[in-house]
Amino acid sequence: MYQPTISHFFKSSQPSSQTDTRQDEDQRLDIESHEQRGGANMNKDELINILGSDSESDQDLDEDLDQDQNNNQDQDQEQDRDLASKANNGRSTLSAERIERRPDFNEKLKTIMRKRNAGSMINTGSDDENDDNDDVKSTKRTKANNKKLTELDQQFKELKLKHMDTILCVRVGYKYKFFAKDAEIVSNILQIKLVPGKKTLDESDPNDRNYRKFQYCSIPDTRLHVHLQRLVFFNYKVAVVEQTETSALKKNNNSGSLFTREIKNIFTKVSYGINETFDKSEDRILGDLTSVWAISINETSKMRKVNLISVQLNSGEIVHDQFSDDILLNVNLEARIRYLNPTEIITEEELPPSIRTIFTKLNQDIQFYQSHKEACPNLFDALQGLDLNNELKRLLSVLHSYLSTFENTKVLYFASNYSSFTAKNFMVLPRNTIESLEIFENSTTNKTNGSLLWVMDHTRTQFGYRLLRKWISKPLIDLKSILDRQDAITCIMKEVHSIFFESFNELLRKSIDLERALNRIAYGSTSRKEVYFFLKQIATFASLFKSHHTFIHDQLHKENSALRKTSCLLFNILQNLDAFFSATDLPLFLQMINVDAALDKDSHKNVIEFFNLNKYDFPEGLLHKYRDIEEVKTELDDELQNIKRVLKRPTLSYKDTKDYLIEVRNTQAKTVPSNWVKVNSTKAVSRFRTPKTEELVGKLLYHNDLLNLLAEDEFKRFLQRIVDRYAEIKTCINNLATYDCILSLAATSSNVNYVKPKLTELHQKVKVKNGRNPIIESLDVNYVPNDVLMSSNSGKINIITGPNMGGKSSYIRQVALLVIMTQIGCYIPADSAEMSICDRIFTRIGSHDDLLNAKSTFQVEMSEVLHILNSSTPRSLLLLDEVGRGTGTHDGLSISFAILNYFVYLADNCPLVLFITHYSALCQIDSKLIANYHMSYIEKHQPGEKWTNVIFLYKLVLGQAHNSYGFNVAKLSNIPTEIINRAFEVSEEKILSSKHHNFLEIMKALKRVNERKLNKEALKKIQAFIEDI
């Protein structure tokens, strides 16, 4: 049976700024006495007598009970309907039947009592929402009565008119409420009750005139972030509206009856991960690898010019880029979408549908927003060293305006966060290559398992994982950088048993996400607990380096040290880290924190006692306010002496040091002066305050609230002192991330039969002995190793034929994966390897159409081939799998032949090409650049089967295959033998027909084209042919 939460029954309205966890013994005894009577017949007034007068209004109680019954309608819908009716008509008792249906009710009463005694930071003062006299089922009203909204609804309306694209989540006491259309949306997503009322702000709905208030639904404040995640997952922007004053401050300022409220946080899918509450145990965070783009696009008839700035809020990485793109292919734009994974696109003007389609085709969750350019001179002063053109600066202003809504602009002010998407020392893999080679996700389930990232990811930290992902997506093309990583891996593998490195590695494994924490500190969205863990982590690293000072000094300063001789990269990392940890004063900041308070679950203690005032270097303001509080407490002690004299009870004391109540037995209540204020009572005792005590308690609450505000200001100042060191801390984290990535590559390289490839820049070459596909091998499949031999001297073009399912596609993917791993700096699965450096890797594998852009499968194939031909260089690696499969045999053969001829024509400028085909006639092309291979097999005949069966050997051997053995694949697919036999007979008849005998004539014609040396004019004809499709 569903059990409602504590907040669904009673909520304290006592405006408290302290927490006292001691239990009220008399309240406990009264509840236990009720339990002994069977737990029934306790009405709401009796509960108020037990718990005191701080329980929420009758209406809120009935409303919560009614909402509970809606959430549990499967089991007790009928009983709840009766109860709601009683509540609305009589509203006098908490029915015994509901208590009986909740066997844990009495236990909950005890929990409520403990919560009441613990106090609360939430003020439920005198807002009309807490003194709501409307029934749960909103009754219809006359026109005269509904012209004026309630104060709370009017406050919501004013906020909503300023944020029409945002769902407002408004704190009302111990709940968060959603109003009007927002409530309708939230109710549907969260499946919670919607209380009827006005649906629109302007009463455009005909039924709105029947209500005075907006329709609404609500959630408990303890479940806020659970529900926020669900809302932003559905791509809604949600703003959390908080009360900005407490009851004590409100009373002292003589403000109106309504609490002031303002937006504290705004969340979207991309910003939630950086703004939500800190949780160091969470592995992968919502929005962790997504980004926000500011983009401008200018189009001509054939080309599209794009400027963009992308910011990843968790890492603080900002990427700027400008490029041109073919308006039909969108290859460059799609590559950037695949790399940077945008979920929010910001523009000044609305993007046309054709552009939106490019984004949503790759990610349906992308949201589009418009923002305006704003002046931000301080930003460009901070970025003076960056080479940004005027258009990128304009986009940066637009992005700044948008992020200011979330208070996430701080990351834009650090020049070290900026980088260009393209650079001279790494290659950019096209989207097709990333997907075809399963770099980040497998193509079956779209999960990380079974991808290259999965094989290579042994990182210990979140920031290390993000950097490794970047390394894999952008392999190096600079020889020295690759060799530096190889040397670092070799050094780590040799030094892995060093005490220092073992301790360092283990410390990394336990590290929080320092990069994310630093940016949350910069944004001001962090928590005190997170700041403590952040500083503690930095201090722990510093302590490790200090304790191993001798080892580090020897490695860094001795000429013959293993580190200095073996790895320049690792040497620089260690040197930079040692310098930072030796000089930083962040461990001193850690000493300024009161650890117990920082980790305390009591939010009030967490705030006002966060600093260790014996160590904190700016304690004056806090100490002054503590003295004010102590003076009031002294006055309360003096007043207690007067009370003792009046009651003639020398041993009397306050009931507690939170509410400062005087407890008198009911039998002696008549002796209490008439001007004393009765606060609450039980069957045994009554509790009072004197007029002076009442005044002093209000004064105490006021000073406590001021202390709270002052502590918040001091915390902000403390955060700013950390942010002032942002650049050097970020550099330190980058060094830690680089080291973590090297550790990960070293772990991968330590696999059995992995070898360090030899690199050369002199000529094109990929030579691998017994190479293996790293992904398939990691899946515990017995993978057959294969050699690779491609060089400028011979075999720059490998034509591969063989049976269907014989392993041709797996083989060419293996070659590309080994090249990528090599240029990341990692060892590879092979006996030996020697490679030149490739500047681009292109793939044309598989087939698919593009219905959104009205492109057939064949047109998509030809467009991609054309892009590859235009974009490849002599240093590129091309993987072409069955080009021409999307059209008829004659056209497919002709196109394949023309493409191969084009590569032959390029001669020394020809890239390395792996060309899979079932057109065996192509193997007749005579050129020293071409080498023919096939995947080996053994033929076998089975009784009753007219066709030839094959046993796959998955071994690449020289020569061509003369049959694709498609009937064998049909058998493996469990097609009935009778059908396959008939298909074989038809095939044999066609082979003997004159139409297929004309293949020899076709080849003679193609050979004549070859003799005329197909040139770039022929390529233009191919392009014209594609455009006419």
From Swiss-Prot:
Keywords from the named record: ATP-binding, DNA damage, DNA repair, DNA-binding, Nucleotide-binding, Nucleus
GO MF annotation, one: ATP-dependent DNA damage sensor activity
Renumbered residue ranges of the record's region Disordered: 1-142
Compositional bias annotation for Basic and acidic residues: 21-47, 97-110
Chief localisation class: nucleus
UniProt GO cellular component terms: nucleus
Binding site for ATP: G802, P803, N804, M805, G806, G807, K808, S809
Polar residues: bias regions: 1-20, 86-95
Sequence segments annotated as region (Mispair-binding domain): 143-270
Any one Gene Ontology BP term: mitotic recombination
Alphabetized InterPro entries for the sequence: DNA_mismatch_repair_MutS-lik_N (IPR007695), DNA_mismatch_repair_MutS/MSH (IPR017261), DNA_mismatch_repair_MutS_C (IPR000432), DNA_mismatch_repair_MutS_clamp (IPR007861), DNA_mismatch_repair_MutS_core (IPR007696), DNA_mismatch_repair_MutS_N (IPR016151), DNA_mismatch_repair_MutS_sf (IPR036187), MutS (IPR045076)
Subcellular location: Nucleus
Bias (Acidic residues) ranges: 55-67
Keyword Nucleotide-binding annotated: yes
Assembly mode: Heterodimer consisting of MSH2-MSH3 (MutS beta). Forms a ternary complex with MutL alpha (MLH1-PMS1).
Described function: Component of the post-replicative DNA mismatch repair system (MMR). Heterodimerizes with MSH2 to form MutS beta, which binds to DNA mismatches thereby initiating DNA repair. MSH3 provides substrate-binding and substrate specificity to the complex. When bound, the MutS beta heterodimer bends the DNA helix and shields approximately 20 base pairs. Acts mainly to repair insertion-deletion loops (IDLs) from 2 to 13 nucleotides in size, but can also repair base-base and single insertion-deletion mismatches that occur during replication.
Family recorded in the similarity comment: Belongs to the DNA mismatch repair MutS family. MSH3 subfamily.
Protein known as: DNA mismatch repair protein MSH3
Organism: Kluyveromyces lactis (strain ATCC 8585 / CBS 2359 / DSM 70799 / NBRC 1267 / NRRL Y-1140 / WM37)
Top-level taxonomy: Eukaryota, Fungi, Dikarya, Ascomycota, Saccharomycotina
